[in-house]
């Protein structure tokens, strides 16, 4: 039978049938009759829809030889053969756009002419018996049923056969041929007898062999077999008294379930200590760009050429001097490193042909800044496993830090609009199916709201820096390569613009494992005076390197230009994630999409357009000490994006732990708000788990303070 199926049906149909069976844990090699039945059903569904179109006037027509220029729409949308999630998405989309009632079971087709879903049946028994089983199962007035048999009979709801005589005859002929082919090979009788009725009751799943033994071994105490455990679980009343249930399950558990009331939760305790400091891999709100508009110089697009061109736009360079030293570092080395960059860039310009990359001379200041020869010597484990007092270093607990106001300002800035666009609208082909049309519309609206957002600039900057650094780490492992920090954007007028934020010099990078570290020194331009918030710049040495003329309302003013220099490090895995920061756009789009879906399901139609275009409506953005902040839909998009971007920029184990543990408390509080009378045990343990993540990370501390604002307002 299996060979017959593979010869008799189109390979695409065979592949879809195999996939469907595997999804339900069935083997096409063993359940061959079922394999044949699924292929037959798929083929009938495809034949049902083949050649049927709707023309420009909305009339149903049959076109057999394809005229590629005709603007035709398929009359039938096929759900059968798609994977379940996709099929349901199509069904939901059709229901939203046409207003048709959503079916309980996944139908096979949708007819755009008659505006109804169709359930196709193919039976080896009497058509009317099978028709009744189908109707009984789906219990829906709205879904049209059409049954075919292998003997040429058919039956349809209200004797409305949907298709013309000829199209149906094609299907019946094909079924008759399949039957004859099977009969000639002696396969028909077994196939005919193997058809079971529509299963409307859940079957008991029999467990045998190893699985049975494992099931018996893994029962909770006091249960002798899987059957009596199953009976116990089936009789479990969900809203009964939990303590009793727990003690019934195991003698060891004695949890007192405490009711969780408005007065129960306390705010999270934020740590004390000096204010937290900036720890991102590059400057955010404090960054300054040297830019060129409409770049058309020779070698445009080669980072080094672009960087030199940007440097030439600034004329206010002066003798650099240290204005905010790094507490622990050898500050003159940072100063010398910057002077060396300037000198070596100058050297490049004096050469005939500018090289594509530039490796710095390995001077003592760079060796120091990049930690050259600082790594402890590695010893083979074989040589030291006999050492009696072998132990890991005692590492000190990190010092706690308190929340500082700068991180909230950073976040606010990330939500703002800039005057440039940082992402282009992707060119994606024409939409064909209704779901694609909705998806494109959402994507375009969302892109319009976030393309100018500063968080989007951070994404593109992060992608660029991480890509360049990973490339250089692999291509020039031993060299101290200079990597310009560049981004590209478009101005309001649509002119292209290339921006230089500063430079990175990378250290030796023999990265074997994902977590092996490459050190780098970053040097970034800024107009921010570090003496205003010295705690923010604890890890930096800041130089004053020039004076910049700025146009203001009162005319030109001269501002000192600073260079923020620090030693930093990253790893292959961190760079890999940094290169994929564009995912943040997707994550925040999906969050917005779930808001649209919620609106749409209430209104029972797609609400995308109204959602984005109703400018008067405000949406909750977040909690602050003042209460629930609200804003336009654009502001919501940008805030969600900024959160996602900061989760990437400030990724850390503290953030992972805080997000996972605080979510549990959040769910309990939400249950209380929804009057679900939640109960908890060991709430103290949960607080401990959350608070052990509040150490010194600025982004985690800010999220914890937001969480406290949420608690205050949620429990009023």
Swiss-Prot record:
Keyword Chloroplast: no
Binding site for Mn(2+) 1: 41, 108, 119-120
Regions that span the bilayer: none
Localization per record: Host cytoplasm; Host nucleus
Cellular compartments per GO CC: host cell cytoplasm; host cell nucleus
Broad class of where this protein is predominantly found: host cell
Database matches in InterPro entries: INFV_PA, PA/PA-X, PA/PA-X_sf
Gene Ontology molecular function: endonuclease activity; metal ion binding; RNA binding
EC number: 3.1.-.-
Gene3D superfamilies: Influenza RNA-dependent RNA polymerase subunit PA, endonuclease domain
Iron keyword on record: no
Modification(s) after translation: Phosphorylated on serines and threonines by host kinases, including human casein kinase II.
Chain location of the short sequence motif Nuclear localization signal 2 (NLS2) per the record: 184-247
Keyword entries, A-Z: Cap snatching, Endonuclease, Eukaryotic host gene expression shutoff by virus, Eukaryotic host transcription shutoff by virus, Host cytoplasm, Host gene expression shutoff by virus, Host nucleus, Host-virus interaction, Hydrolase, Inhibition of host RNA polymerase II by virus, Manganese, Metal-binding, Nuclease, Phosphoprotein
Cofactor note as given: Binds 2 manganese ions per subunit.
Cofactor (UniProt): Mn(2+)
Chain positions of motif Nuclear localization signal 1 (NLS1): 124-139
General function of this protein: Plays an essential role in viral RNA transcription and replication by forming the heterotrimeric polymerase complex together with PB1 and PB2 subunits. The complex transcribes viral mRNAs by using a unique mechanism called cap-snatching. It consists in the hijacking and cleavage of host capped pre-mRNAs. These short capped RNAs are then used as primers for viral mRNAs. The PB2 subunit is responsible for the binding of the 5' cap of cellular pre-mRNAs which are subsequently cleaved after 10-13 nucleotides by the PA subunit that carries the endonuclease activity.
HAMAP family: INFV_PA
Subunit organization: Influenza RNA polymerase is composed of three subunits: PB1, PB2 and PA. Interacts (via C-terminus) with PB1 (via N-terminus).
UniProt name for this protein: Polymerase acidic protein
Organism of origin: Influenza A virus (strain A/Pintail/Alberta/119/1979 H4N6)
């Amino acid at each position: 039978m299996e060979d017959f199926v593979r010869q008799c049906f189109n390979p695409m149909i065979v592949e879809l049938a195999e996939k469907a069976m595997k999804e339900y844990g069935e083997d096409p090699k063993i359940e061959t009759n079922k394999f044949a039945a699924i292929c037959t059903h798929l083929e009938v569904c495809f034949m049902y829809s083949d050649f049927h179109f709707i023309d420009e006037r909305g009339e149903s027509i049959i076109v057999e030889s394809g005229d590629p220029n005709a603007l035709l729409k398929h009359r039938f949308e096929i759900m059968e053969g798609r994977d379940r999630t996709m099929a349901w998405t199509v069904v939901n989309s059709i229901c939203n756009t046409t207003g048709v009632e959503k079916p309980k079971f996944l139908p096979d087709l949708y007819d755009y002419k008659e505006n109804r879903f169709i359930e196709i049946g193919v039976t080896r028994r009497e058509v009317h018996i099978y028709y009744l089983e189908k109707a009984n199962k789906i219990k829906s007035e709205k879904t049209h049923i059409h049954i075919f048999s292998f003997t040429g009979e058919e039956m349809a709801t209200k004797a409305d056969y949907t298709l013309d005589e000829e199209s149906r005859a094609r299907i019946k002929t094909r079924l008759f041929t399949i039957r004859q082919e099977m009969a000639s090979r002696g396969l028909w009788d077994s196939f005919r007898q193997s058809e079971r009725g529509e299963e409307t009751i859940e079957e008991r799943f029999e467990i045998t062999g190893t699985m049975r033994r494992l099931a018996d071994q893994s029962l909770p105490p006091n249960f002798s077999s899987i059957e009596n455990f199953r009976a116990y679980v089936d009789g479990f009343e969900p809203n009964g008294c939990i303590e009793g249930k727990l003690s019934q399950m195991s003698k060891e558990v004695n949890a007192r379930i405490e009711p969780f009331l408005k007065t129960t939760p306390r705010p999270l305790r934020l740590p004390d200590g000096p204010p937290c400091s900036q720890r991102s891999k590059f400057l955010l709100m404090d960054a300054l760009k040297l830019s060129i508009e409409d770049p058309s110089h020779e070698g445009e697009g080669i980072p080094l050429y672009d960087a030199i061109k940007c440097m030439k736009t600034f004329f206010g360079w002066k003798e650099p001097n240290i204005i905010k030293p790094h507490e622990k570092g050898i500050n003159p080395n940072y100063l010398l490193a910057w002077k060396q960059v300037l000198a070596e860039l100058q050297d490049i310009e004096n050469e005939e042909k500018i090289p594509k990359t530039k490796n710095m001379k390995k001077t003592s200041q760079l060796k120091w800044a990049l930690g050259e020869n600082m790594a402890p010597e590695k010893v083979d484990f074989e040589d030291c496993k006999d050492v009696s007092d072998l132990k890991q270093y005692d590492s000190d607990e990190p010092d706690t830090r308190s929340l500082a106001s700068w991180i909230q300002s950073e976040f606010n800035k990330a939500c703002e609009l800039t005057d440039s666009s940082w992402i282009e609208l992707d060119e994606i082909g024409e939409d064909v199916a209704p779901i694609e049309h909705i998806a494109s519309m959402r994507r375009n609206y969302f892109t319009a709201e976030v393309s100018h957002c500063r968080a989007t600039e951070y994404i593109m900057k992060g992608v660029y820096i991480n890509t360049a650094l990973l490339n250089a780490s692999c291509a020039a492992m031993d060299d101290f390569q200079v990597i310009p920090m560049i981004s590209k954007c478009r101005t309001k007028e649509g002119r292209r613009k290339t921006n230089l934020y500063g430079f990175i010099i990378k250290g030796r990078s023999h990265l074997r494992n994902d977590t092996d570290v490459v050190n780098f020194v970053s040097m970034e331009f800024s107009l921010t005076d570090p003496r205003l918030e010295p705690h923010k710049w604890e890890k930096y040495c800041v130089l004053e390197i020039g004076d910049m003329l700025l146009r203001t309302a009162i005319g030109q003013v001269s501002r000192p230009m600073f260079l923020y220099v620090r030693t930093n490090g990253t790893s292959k895995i961190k760079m890999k994630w940094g290169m994929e920061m564009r995912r943040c756009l997707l994550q925040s789009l999906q969050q917005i999409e779930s808001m649209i879906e919620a609106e749409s399901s209430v209104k029972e139609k797609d609400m995308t357009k109204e959602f984005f275009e109703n400018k008067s409506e405000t949406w909750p953005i977040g909690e602050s000490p003042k209460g629930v902040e609200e804003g336009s839909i654009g502001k919501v998009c940008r805030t969600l994006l900024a959160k996602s971007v900061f989760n990437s920029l400030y990724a850390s184990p503290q953030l992972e732990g805080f997000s996972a543990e605080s979510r549990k408390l959040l769910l309990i509080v939400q249950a209380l708000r929804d009057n679900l009378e939640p109960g908890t045990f060991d709430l103290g343990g949960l607080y401990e788990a959350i608070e052990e993540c509040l150490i010194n990370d600025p982004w985690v501390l800010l999220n914890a303070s937001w969480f406290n604002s949420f608690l205050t307002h949620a429990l009023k």
